[in-house]
Curated annotation (Swiss-Prot):
Glycans are attached at residues 274, 284, 397. Residues 1-30 form the signal peptide. SMART domains: LamG. This is Sex hormone-binding globulin. The gene is Shbg. It comes from Mus musculus.
Length: 403
Protein backbone atom coordinates (compact mmCIF):
# COMPACT_ATOMS: atom_id res chain seq x y z
CA UNK A 1 0.00 0.00 0.00
CA UNK A 2 2.84 2.37 0.94
CA UNK A 3 4.56 1.56 -2.36
CA UNK A 4 1.44 2.43 -4.39
CA UNK A 5 1.07 5.70 -2.46
CA UNK A 6 4.74 6.51 -3.11
CA UNK A 7 4.37 5.82 -6.87
CA UNK A 8 1.22 7.98 -7.03
CA UNK A 9 3.07 10.79 -5.25
CA UNK A 10 5.98 10.59 -7.72
CA UNK A 11 3.56 10.79 -10.67
CA UNK A 12 1.87 13.84 -9.17
CA UNK A 13 5.25 15.53 -8.66
CA UNK A 14 6.27 14.71 -12.25
CA UNK A 15 3.01 16.15 -13.59
CA UNK A 16 3.50 19.30 -11.52
CA UNK A 17 7.05 19.73 -12.88
CA UNK A 18 5.78 19.37 -16.45
CA UNK A 19 3.15 22.03 -15.85
CA UNK A 20 5.76 24.39 -14.41
CA UNK A 21 8.28 23.92 -17.23
CA UNK A 22 8.85 27.05 -19.37
CA UNK A 23 7.37 27.04 -22.87
CA UNK A 24 9.49 26.39 -25.99
CA UNK A 25 11.98 29.12 -26.76
CA UNK A 26 12.92 31.11 -29.82
CA UNK A 27 16.66 31.67 -29.97
CA UNK A 28 16.97 31.19 -26.23
CA UNK A 29 13.96 33.35 -25.29
CA UNK A 30 10.70 32.02 -23.90
CA UNK A 31 7.73 32.59 -26.15
CA UNK A 32 4.94 34.32 -24.30
CA UNK A 33 1.30 35.09 -24.88
CA UNK A 34 0.83 38.83 -25.18
CA UNK A 35 -2.32 39.96 -23.41
CA UNK A 36 -4.24 42.55 -25.47
CA UNK A 37 -4.64 44.83 -22.44
CA UNK A 38 -1.85 47.29 -21.64
CA UNK A 39 -0.46 46.65 -18.14
CA UNK A 40 0.65 49.32 -15.71
CA UNK A 41 4.32 48.27 -16.09
CA UNK A 42 4.37 48.69 -19.88
CA UNK A 43 5.60 51.89 -21.54
CA UNK A 44 2.78 53.92 -23.09
CA UNK A 45 1.56 52.61 -26.42
CA UNK A 46 1.49 54.96 -29.40
CA UNK A 47 -1.52 55.39 -31.66
CA UNK A 48 -0.44 54.86 -35.27
CA UNK A 49 -2.84 57.12 -37.16
CA UNK A 50 -2.81 60.87 -37.72
CA UNK A 51 -6.11 60.83 -39.58
CA UNK A 52 -7.13 60.04 -43.15
CA UNK A 53 -3.89 61.20 -44.81
CA UNK A 54 -0.39 59.72 -44.90
CA UNK A 55 1.32 61.91 -42.29
CA UNK A 56 3.33 59.80 -39.80
CA UNK A 57 2.72 60.11 -36.08
CA UNK A 58 6.46 60.51 -35.58
CA UNK A 59 9.75 60.47 -37.52
CA UNK A 60 13.14 59.40 -36.13
CA UNK A 61 16.54 60.04 -37.72
CA UNK A 62 19.15 57.41 -36.83
CA UNK A 63 22.92 57.76 -37.31
CA UNK A 64 23.96 54.56 -39.11
CA UNK A 65 27.58 54.97 -37.99
CA UNK A 66 26.53 54.51 -34.34
CA UNK A 67 24.41 51.37 -34.63
CA UNK A 68 25.60 48.53 -32.41
CA UNK A 69 22.74 46.11 -33.17
CA UNK A 70 21.09 45.86 -36.63
CA UNK A 71 17.89 44.78 -34.92
CA UNK A 72 14.40 46.28 -34.43
CA UNK A 73 11.44 44.98 -32.46
CA UNK A 74 7.97 46.11 -31.44
CA UNK A 75 4.48 44.90 -30.59
CA UNK A 76 1.37 46.11 -32.38
CA UNK A 77 -2.36 45.46 -32.40
CA UNK A 78 -5.11 46.46 -34.81
CA UNK A 79 -8.50 45.53 -36.21
CA UNK A 80 -7.62 47.44 -39.39
CA UNK A 81 -6.78 45.22 -42.41
CA UNK A 82 -4.74 47.82 -44.30
CA UNK A 83 -2.20 50.51 -43.51
CA UNK A 84 1.42 51.40 -42.77
CA UNK A 85 3.13 50.17 -39.60
CA UNK A 86 6.44 51.85 -40.39
CA UNK A 87 8.41 53.26 -43.31
CA UNK A 88 12.18 53.75 -43.51
CA UNK A 89 14.55 55.34 -46.00
CA UNK A 90 17.97 56.85 -46.59
CA UNK A 91 16.47 58.74 -49.53
CA UNK A 92 13.00 58.67 -51.07
CA UNK A 93 14.15 58.11 -54.64
CA UNK A 94 16.07 54.84 -54.57
CA UNK A 95 16.41 53.46 -51.04
CA UNK A 96 13.24 52.92 -49.01
CA UNK A 97 11.44 50.16 -47.11
CA UNK A 98 7.85 49.69 -45.94
CA UNK A 99 6.19 47.25 -43.53
CA UNK A 100 2.41 47.38 -43.50
CA UNK A 101 -0.78 45.36 -43.70
CA UNK A 102 -2.89 44.44 -46.69
CA UNK A 103 -5.97 42.24 -46.27
CA UNK A 104 -4.79 41.65 -42.70
CA UNK A 105 -1.43 40.13 -43.73
CA UNK A 106 1.99 41.68 -43.34
CA UNK A 107 3.44 43.16 -46.52
CA UNK A 108 6.96 44.37 -47.25
CA UNK A 109 7.72 46.78 -50.08
CA UNK A 110 11.39 47.40 -50.76
CA UNK A 111 13.11 49.60 -53.33
CA UNK A 112 16.90 50.01 -53.54
CA UNK A 113 19.87 49.39 -55.82
CA UNK A 114 19.99 45.67 -54.92
CA UNK A 115 16.34 44.68 -54.98
CA UNK A 116 12.87 45.95 -55.84
CA UNK A 117 10.13 43.72 -54.52
CA UNK A 118 6.77 43.40 -52.81
CA UNK A 119 5.92 40.36 -50.71
CA UNK A 120 2.92 39.53 -48.53
CA UNK A 121 3.22 36.77 -45.95
CA UNK A 122 2.03 35.19 -42.72
CA UNK A 123 -1.37 34.82 -41.06
CA UNK A 124 -3.92 37.60 -40.67
CA UNK A 125 -2.95 39.87 -37.78
CA UNK A 126 -5.97 42.21 -37.74
CA UNK A 127 -7.48 40.41 -34.75
CA UNK A 128 -7.11 43.05 -32.03
CA UNK A 129 -4.37 41.14 -30.16
CA UNK A 130 -0.85 42.29 -29.43
CA UNK A 131 1.65 40.68 -31.81
CA UNK A 132 5.44 40.90 -31.21
CA UNK A 133 7.45 41.53 -34.39
CA UNK A 134 11.24 41.37 -34.78
CA UNK A 135 13.39 42.38 -37.76
CA UNK A 136 17.10 41.74 -38.11
CA UNK A 137 19.59 42.68 -40.82
CA UNK A 138 22.21 39.95 -41.22
CA UNK A 139 24.68 41.07 -43.87
CA UNK A 140 22.67 41.37 -47.08
CA UNK A 141 19.67 39.49 -45.63
CA UNK A 142 16.53 40.48 -43.74
CA UNK A 143 14.94 38.11 -41.23
CA UNK A 144 11.52 38.69 -39.68
CA UNK A 145 9.72 36.95 -36.79
CA UNK A 146 6.08 37.30 -35.73
CA UNK A 147 4.77 35.90 -32.44
CA UNK A 148 8.16 34.24 -31.91
CA UNK A 149 8.07 32.35 -35.22
CA UNK A 150 10.32 33.02 -38.20
CA UNK A 151 8.04 34.18 -41.01
CA UNK A 152 10.37 35.52 -43.67
CA UNK A 153 13.98 35.48 -44.84
CA UNK A 154 14.97 37.70 -47.77
CA UNK A 155 18.53 37.35 -49.08
CA UNK A 156 20.69 39.60 -51.25
CA UNK A 157 18.37 42.57 -50.82
CA UNK A 158 20.69 45.24 -49.41
CA UNK A 159 24.18 46.21 -48.42
CA UNK A 160 24.96 45.64 -44.75
CA UNK A 161 24.31 48.65 -42.54
CA UNK A 162 28.04 48.91 -41.80
CA UNK A 163 28.81 49.20 -45.53
CA UNK A 164 25.95 51.58 -46.36
CA UNK A 165 26.96 54.66 -48.34
CA UNK A 166 24.43 56.86 -46.51
CA UNK A 167 25.13 57.98 -42.95
CA UNK A 168 21.59 58.37 -41.65
CA UNK A 169 18.21 56.68 -41.90
CA UNK A 170 14.72 58.01 -41.27
CA UNK A 171 12.05 55.81 -39.68
CA UNK A 172 8.43 57.00 -39.78
CA UNK A 173 5.66 55.37 -37.72
CA UNK A 174 2.14 55.05 -39.10
CA UNK A 175 2.72 56.96 -42.33
CA UNK A 176 4.89 57.69 -45.35
CA UNK A 177 7.60 60.17 -46.29
CA UNK A 178 6.97 59.78 -50.02
CA UNK A 179 3.78 60.03 -52.10
CA UNK A 180 1.61 56.90 -52.15
CA UNK A 181 1.88 56.98 -55.95
CA UNK A 182 5.58 56.07 -55.61
CA UNK A 183 4.83 52.82 -53.78
CA UNK A 184 5.20 49.67 -55.80
CA UNK A 185 1.59 48.79 -54.94
CA UNK A 186 -0.31 51.73 -53.39
CA UNK A 187 -2.28 51.16 -50.19
CA UNK A 188 -4.27 53.30 -47.75
CA UNK A 189 -1.53 54.53 -45.34
CA UNK A 190 -3.69 55.35 -42.28
CA UNK A 191 -3.74 52.44 -39.81
CA UNK A 192 -6.10 52.38 -36.84
CA UNK A 193 -3.70 50.55 -34.54
CA UNK A 194 -1.26 50.83 -31.66
CA UNK A 195 2.43 50.11 -31.22
CA UNK A 196 4.44 49.63 -28.01
CA UNK A 197 7.79 48.33 -26.68
CA UNK A 198 9.38 49.51 -29.92
CA UNK A 199 13.16 49.57 -30.38
CA UNK A 200 14.56 50.80 -33.71
CA UNK A 201 18.16 49.76 -34.44
CA UNK A 202 18.90 50.04 -30.73
CA UNK A 203 17.02 53.34 -30.27
CA UNK A 204 13.82 53.65 -28.25
CA UNK A 205 11.18 55.89 -29.77
CA UNK A 206 10.05 58.76 -27.55
CA UNK A 207 6.65 60.30 -28.26
CA UNK A 208 5.49 63.41 -26.43
CA UNK A 209 1.77 63.64 -25.68
CA UNK A 210 -0.08 66.15 -27.86
CA UNK A 211 -3.57 66.50 -29.36
CA UNK A 212 -2.35 64.81 -32.55
CA UNK A 213 -0.22 62.11 -30.91
CA UNK A 214 -2.05 61.14 -27.73
CA UNK A 215 -2.65 57.63 -26.46
CA UNK A 216 -5.85 57.58 -28.48
CA UNK A 217 -7.56 54.24 -28.19
CA UNK A 218 -4.43 52.39 -27.03
CA UNK A 219 -5.27 52.42 -23.33
CA UNK A 220 -8.83 51.02 -23.45
CA UNK A 221 -10.34 47.60 -24.13
CA UNK A 222 -11.35 47.40 -27.79
CA UNK A 223 -13.75 45.62 -30.09
CA UNK A 224 -13.96 45.81 -33.90
CA UNK A 225 -16.16 48.56 -35.31
CA UNK A 226 -16.30 52.18 -36.47
CA UNK A 227 -16.29 54.70 -33.61
CA UNK A 228 -17.40 58.33 -33.75
CA UNK A 229 -16.28 60.26 -30.62
CA UNK A 230 -18.33 63.37 -29.76
CA UNK A 231 -18.09 66.14 -32.34
CA UNK A 232 -16.69 63.97 -35.14
CA UNK A 233 -18.26 63.50 -38.56
CA UNK A 234 -17.82 61.89 -41.98
CA UNK A 235 -19.36 63.07 -45.23
CA UNK A 236 -20.05 60.98 -48.34
CA UNK A 237 -21.00 62.36 -51.75
CA UNK A 238 -24.32 60.88 -52.88
CA UNK A 239 -22.75 60.44 -56.31
CA UNK A 240 -20.00 58.20 -54.89
CA UNK A 241 -22.18 55.72 -52.98
CA UNK A 242 -24.58 53.04 -54.31
CA UNK A 243 -27.46 54.72 -56.15
CA UNK A 244 -31.23 54.40 -55.52
CA UNK A 245 -33.21 51.78 -57.42
CA UNK A 246 -35.00 53.44 -60.34
CA UNK A 247 -38.25 51.48 -60.74
CA UNK A 248 -39.74 51.77 -58.24
CA UNK A 249 -37.58 54.53 -56.77
CA UNK A 250 -36.20 53.35 -53.41
CA UNK A 251 -33.16 54.06 -51.28
CA UNK A 252 -32.18 52.24 -48.10
CA UNK A 253 -29.40 52.21 -45.54
CA UNK A 254 -28.70 50.21 -42.40
CA UNK A 255 -26.67 51.01 -39.29
CA UNK A 256 -25.56 48.28 -36.89
CA UNK A 257 -24.96 49.71 -33.41
CA UNK A 258 -22.65 48.31 -30.74
CA UNK A 259 -22.52 51.36 -28.51
CA UNK A 260 -24.45 54.63 -28.16
CA UNK A 261 -23.87 57.43 -25.67
CA UNK A 262 -24.94 61.07 -25.34
CA UNK A 263 -27.17 63.18 -27.58
CA UNK A 264 -26.67 64.83 -30.96
CA UNK A 265 -26.70 64.36 -34.71
CA UNK A 266 -26.44 60.81 -36.06
CA UNK A 267 -27.17 61.07 -39.78
CA UNK A 268 -28.26 63.69 -42.31
CA UNK A 269 -29.16 63.92 -46.00
CA UNK A 270 -28.73 67.32 -47.61
CA UNK A 271 -26.72 69.62 -49.84
CA UNK A 272 -24.04 72.22 -49.28
CA UNK A 273 -26.71 74.90 -48.82
CA UNK A 274 -29.09 72.72 -46.80
CA UNK A 275 -27.44 70.10 -44.64
CA UNK A 276 -30.62 69.15 -42.83
CA UNK A 277 -33.20 68.07 -45.41
CA UNK A 278 -33.55 64.79 -43.51
CA UNK A 279 -32.08 64.25 -40.04
CA UNK A 280 -31.72 61.47 -37.52
CA UNK A 281 -30.71 62.55 -34.00
CA UNK A 282 -29.70 60.55 -30.94
CA UNK A 283 -31.58 61.64 -27.85
CA UNK A 284 -32.03 59.81 -24.54
CA UNK A 285 -31.32 56.37 -26.07
CA UNK A 286 -33.86 57.06 -28.84
CA UNK A 287 -33.54 58.11 -32.47
CA UNK A 288 -35.51 61.12 -33.71
CA UNK A 289 -36.37 61.40 -37.43
CA UNK A 290 -37.14 64.91 -38.68
CA UNK A 291 -37.25 67.00 -41.84
CA UNK A 292 -37.13 70.79 -41.71
CA UNK A 293 -40.39 72.05 -40.12
CA UNK A 294 -42.27 68.75 -40.38
CA UNK A 295 -43.43 66.70 -37.35
CA UNK A 296 -40.80 64.52 -35.72
CA UNK A 297 -41.09 60.80 -35.08
CA UNK A 298 -39.28 59.03 -32.24
CA UNK A 299 -38.10 55.42 -32.13
CA UNK A 300 -36.60 53.87 -28.94
CA UNK A 301 -33.15 52.49 -29.78
CA UNK A 302 -32.16 48.89 -29.03
CA UNK A 303 -28.38 48.51 -29.28
CA UNK A 304 -27.67 45.22 -31.05
CA UNK A 305 -30.48 45.48 -33.61
CA UNK A 306 -29.79 47.17 -36.98
CA UNK A 307 -31.45 50.55 -37.54
CA UNK A 308 -32.93 50.78 -41.05
CA UNK A 309 -33.91 53.87 -43.04
CA UNK A 310 -35.93 53.31 -46.23
CA UNK A 311 -37.10 56.02 -48.63
CA UNK A 312 -39.52 55.70 -51.53
CA UNK A 313 -41.83 58.04 -53.47
CA UNK A 314 -44.48 58.25 -50.75
CA UNK A 315 -42.80 57.80 -47.37
CA UNK A 316 -39.69 57.62 -45.21
CA UNK A 317 -39.59 54.58 -42.90
CA UNK A 318 -37.40 54.29 -39.81
CA UNK A 319 -37.40 50.79 -38.34
CA UNK A 320 -35.57 48.55 -35.91
CA UNK A 321 -36.70 44.95 -35.52
CA UNK A 322 -40.51 44.95 -35.20
CA UNK A 323 -40.67 48.68 -34.37
CA UNK A 324 -41.42 51.18 -37.13
CA UNK A 325 -42.11 54.91 -37.54
CA UNK A 326 -43.20 56.58 -40.80
CA UNK A 327 -43.02 60.10 -42.24
CA UNK A 328 -45.47 60.63 -45.08
CA UNK A 329 -44.02 62.07 -48.29
CA UNK A 330 -47.08 64.27 -48.65
CA UNK A 331 -45.49 66.39 -45.95
CA UNK A 332 -41.94 66.21 -47.22
CA UNK A 333 -42.00 67.70 -50.74
CA UNK A 334 -40.81 64.59 -52.63
CA UNK A 335 -39.22 66.56 -55.49
CA UNK A 336 -36.61 67.89 -53.03
CA UNK A 337 -35.68 64.33 -52.12
CA UNK A 338 -35.11 63.18 -55.68
CA UNK A 339 -33.07 66.28 -56.52
CA UNK A 340 -30.55 65.44 -53.80
CA UNK A 341 -29.01 62.69 -55.95
CA UNK A 342 -28.57 64.95 -58.97
CA UNK A 343 -27.28 67.90 -56.94
CA UNK A 344 -23.46 68.23 -57.24
CA UNK A 345 -23.24 68.85 -53.48
CA UNK A 346 -25.75 66.21 -52.40
CA UNK A 347 -24.29 64.32 -49.46
CA UNK A 348 -24.87 61.81 -46.69
CA UNK A 349 -23.22 62.70 -43.39
CA UNK A 350 -22.62 60.67 -40.23
CA UNK A 351 -22.03 62.23 -36.83
CA UNK A 352 -22.07 65.89 -35.84
CA UNK A 353 -22.54 68.48 -38.56
CA UNK A 354 -19.52 70.82 -38.93
CA UNK A 355 -19.65 73.48 -36.23
CA UNK A 356 -22.36 71.67 -34.26
CA UNK A 357 -21.96 71.05 -30.54
CA UNK A 358 -22.72 67.39 -29.84
CA UNK A 359 -22.19 64.96 -26.97
CA UNK A 360 -23.22 61.96 -29.07
CA UNK A 361 -20.76 59.11 -29.55
CA UNK A 362 -21.52 55.80 -31.19
CA UNK A 363 -19.93 52.60 -32.46
CA UNK A 364 -21.10 50.97 -35.69
CA UNK A 365 -20.56 47.29 -36.42
CA UNK A 366 -21.80 47.78 -39.99
CA UNK A 367 -22.87 50.55 -42.34
CA UNK A 368 -24.80 49.37 -45.40
CA UNK A 369 -26.14 51.44 -48.29
CA UNK A 370 -28.37 49.77 -50.87
CA UNK A 371 -27.25 46.37 -49.58
CA UNK A 372 -23.53 47.18 -49.97
CA UNK A 373 -21.12 47.73 -47.09
CA UNK A 374 -19.78 51.29 -47.12
CA UNK A 375 -16.13 51.81 -46.16
CA UNK A 376 -15.17 54.91 -44.19
CA UNK A 377 -12.21 55.31 -46.57
CA UNK A 378 -14.76 56.21 -49.27
CA UNK A 379 -15.74 59.36 -47.36
CA UNK A 380 -15.36 62.69 -49.13
CA UNK A 381 -14.08 64.07 -45.83
CA UNK A 382 -13.93 62.91 -42.23
CA UNK A 383 -12.67 63.95 -38.83
CA UNK A 384 -9.16 62.72 -38.06
CA UNK A 385 -10.32 61.51 -34.63
CA UNK A 386 -12.69 58.82 -35.94
CA UNK A 387 -11.53 55.31 -35.03
CA UNK A 388 -11.93 53.62 -38.40
CA UNK A 389 -11.78 49.96 -37.32
CA UNK A 390 -12.08 49.84 -33.53
CA UNK A 391 -14.47 50.83 -30.74
CA UNK A 392 -14.24 50.96 -26.95
CA UNK A 393 -15.95 48.09 -25.18
CA UNK A 394 -17.95 50.61 -23.14
CA UNK A 395 -18.33 54.40 -22.94
CA UNK A 396 -15.88 56.11 -20.60
CA UNK A 397 -14.36 59.51 -19.92
CA UNK A 398 -11.41 58.52 -22.13
CA UNK A 399 -13.63 58.03 -25.19
CA UNK A 400 -15.95 60.99 -24.74
CA UNK A 401 -13.18 63.20 -26.07
CA UNK A 402 -11.18 62.93 -29.26
CA UNK A 403 -7.66 61.51 -29.61
Amino acid sequence: MEKRDSVALHWRLLLLLLLLMPPPTHQGRALRHIDPIQSAQDPPAKYLSNGPGQEPVMVMTIDLTKISKPHSSFEFRTWDPEGVIFYGDTNTEDDWFLLGLRAGQLEIQLHNAWARLTVGFGPRLDDGRWHPVELKMNGDSLLLWVDGKEMLCLRQISASLADHSQRSMRIALGGLLLPTSKLRFPLVPALDGCIRRDIWLGHQAQLSASPRTSLGNCDVDLQPGLFFPPGTHAEFSLQDIPQPHADPWTFSLELGFKLVDGSGQLLALGTGTNSSWLNIHLQNQSVVLSSEAEPKVVLPLDVGLPLQLTLDRVKVVLSQGPKMEVLSMSLLRPASLWRLWSHPQGHLSLGALPGESSSASFCLSDFWVQGQRLDIDQALSRSQDIWTHSCPQRPSNDTRTSH
